[in-house]
Swiss-Prot record:
Protein family membership: Belongs to the TrpB family.
Official protein name in the record: Tryptophan synthase beta chain
PROSITE patterns named among the record's database cross-references: TRP_SYNTHASE_BETA
EC numbers, comma separated: 4.2.1.20
Reaction it catalyzes: (1S,2R)-1-C-(indol-3-yl)glycerol 3-phosphate + L-serine = D-glyceraldehyde 3-phosphate + L-tryptophan + H2O
Assigned keywords, A-Z: Amino-acid biosynthesis, Aromatic amino acid biosynthesis, Lyase, Pyridoxal phosphate, Tryptophan biosynthesis
Keyword Amino-acid biosynthesis found: yes
Gene this protein is translated from: trpB
Pathway the protein acts in: Amino-acid biosynthesis; L-tryptophan biosynthesis; L-tryptophan from chorismate: step 5/5
GO molecular function: tryptophan synthase activity
Subunit structure: Tetramer of two alpha and two beta chains.
Modified residues (N6-(pyridoxal phosphate)lysine): 98
Record Pfam families: PALP
């Protein structure tokens, strides 16, 4: 890591929404006034104690925060090395970390007088969280979801509809998260007056990457306090799965200036990081480009055309990554690795068998890397992994991958 870096890794983005060479605002002229107004409103809300009082009240009484920091004793014994702690964000209302951010954005939308909320979703968890909070506040909700993801995440589609949301299947491209985000942006341009776009990850044009990070940072803030209480010191290693990267950024951000804490993000390796791009590991196998309003690492061909990635995990099936992650990668503050579908499935089963926790396929990727490195680490080494979602939504996908019959026969 260069010696001449700024004293803090937590000062970004700059006034142009940049994290080094990444981020920014690459949007149409139609959207620019909306983006600038959103930035103004968020900058004001950030300094308004009443805004954060409402956030913390709802995090506590509606979401169920703080989420526990859990010592995975049997998993630690099975792996035979480092102590493994799980930050249990799958216990949040709606079953994932997504609601942490959704609450903040929708409180902001209400302050701005917006009556219609749109969102994109991959695994469906951001869509469910958005539909949930819209129902609580009586707002119209439209969720764009790739047609392929609608098929493989049917339980979450039904949940969104139960909550009153309109779910719009997106058939363009491969029908995944990238395509859903494209259509959501088109909707926003068309319905600028009454509509607020609630982005679910630390991507998109500024101020979204920083705003989503700030709302998700409650994960890492709690983990710091809980780890100090449990162990009397900070963890040695943080590990989290990365699609766009919001759960990881939420865990990592409060620890960025703790140089003794190693930070590892785990991308979706699909069938393996290869020239066929049968993966979604944009940092491992991509290069810089522009998508969805920000400059970051992307899966693309020689002509700069965005490629369709592949992952068994709908929530990680995105050909890019948040710009702050791209910056942390390039300056060496965080390390990024990839895990294949097969490795994630093994970790999914390991967690079920050892801890009685059914993880989502997204954190199963992080858990697979934990299982890979923990046995070779000393017993006093502490790993803190973000369990960012529960696996109810994935049981049909996992059953199919494992060749299990879900027809009801024992």
């Amino acid at each position: 890591m260069p010696d001449d870096l700024i004293n803090s890794f937590m000062t970004g983005p700059d006034e142009n929404g940049r994290f080094g060479d990444f981020g920014g605002r690459f949007v149409s002229e139609t959207l620019m006034p909306l983006i600038l107004e959103l930035e103004r409103q968020y900058e004001f809300a950030k300094t308004d104690q009443a805004f954060w009082d409402e956030m913390h009240h709802l995090w506590t009484h509606y979401v169920g925060r703080p989420s526990p920091l859990y010592f995975a004793e049997r998993l630690t014994e099975r792996l035979g090395g480092a102590k493994v702690y799980l930050k249990r964000d799958e216990l949040n209302h709606t079953g994932a970390h997504k609601i942490n951010n959704v609450l903040g954005q929708i409180i902001l939308a209400r302050r701005m007088g917006k009556t219609r909320i749109i969102a994109e979703t991959g695994a469906g968890q951001h869509g469910v969280a958005t539909a949930t909070v819209c129902a609580k506040f009586g707002l119209k909700c439209v969720v764009y979801m790739g047609a392929h993801d609608v098929e493989r995440q049917a339980p979450n589609v039904f949940r969104m509809k139960l909550l009153g949301a309109e779910v719009v299947p997106v058939t363009s491209g491969r029908g995944t998260l990238k395509d859903a985000m494209n259509d959501a942006l088109r909707d926003w341009v068309t319905n600028v007056r009454e509509t607020f776009y609630c982005i679910g990850t630390v991507a998109g044009p500024h101020p979204y990457p920083a705003m989503v990070r700030d709302f998700q940072a409650i994960i890492g803030q709690e983990a710091r306090e809980q780890m100090m209480e449990a162990e009397g010191r900070l963890p040695d290693t943080l590990i989290a799965a990365i699609g766009g990267g919001s759960n990881a950024m939420g865990l990592f951000y409060p620890f960025l200036d703790d140089k003794e804490v190693a930070i590892i993000g785990v991308e979706a390796g699909g069938k393996g990081v290869n020239e066929k791009m049968e993966h979604c590991a944009s940092l491992t196998g991509g290069r810089p480009g522009v998508l969805h309003g920000n400059r970051t690492y992307l899966l693309q061909d020689d002509d700069g055309q965005i490629l369709e990635g592949f992952s068994i995990s709908a929530g990680l099936d995105y050909p890019g990554i948040g710009p702050e992650h791209a910056w942390l990668h390039d300056i060496g503050r965080a390390k990024y690795v990839s895990i294949t579908d097969a490795e994630a499935l093994d970790a999914f089963q390991l967690c079920c068998e050892t801890e009685g926790i059914i993880p989502a396929l997204e954190p199963s990727h992080a858990l697979a890397h934990v299982a890979k490195i923990a046995p070779d680490l000393p017993r006093d080494h502490i790993i803190c992994m973000n369990m960012c979602g529960r696996g109810d939504k994935d049981i049909f996908t996992v059953a199919k991958a494992l060749g299990q019959d879900m027809s009801g026969a024992v």
